[in-house]
Amino acid sequence: MKEKDIGNLQHTTWRCQYHIVFAPKYRRLAIYGQIKKDVGQILRKLCEQKGVEIIEAEACPDHIHMLISIPPKYSVSQIMGYLKGKSSLMIFDRHANLKYKYGDRHFWARGYYVDTVGRNKKQIQEYIRSQLEEDKIADQISIKEFIDPFTGSKNSKA
């Protein structure tokens, strides 16, 4: 263990690191452009307020990956409830037009993925860094060219 990975409180020494993934409601491709910048700023600000360190993060169009260190006074579910709840309100304040897509002011889908980080921290950091590029490649692979049976010409949509 490296010293910088270990946190200290008055009577506690700790290293509580988690890989967390969560997505917008309906897994919509909503995190791009100005919204992506705002989501990043909002999540950084909220984490800072709770003393949560963001070690690595990536915002893909349809989900967020975060490698974070949470102080032991908070549970993962407390932090996720706080991040998703507060960030939803802040996102809707900055982007009022989203209320037409997400009428109930819930920007994030219910639930999230969480995994503890142990000795595989470097692999998880690399995985998070590569996610955006892998998503782009997967999107390009999934683009199908359809041939019109009557004309024989290629169509890009079904």
Question: Predicted regions: what is each one?
Answer:
Residues 1-158:
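Basic nucleic-acid-binding interfaces
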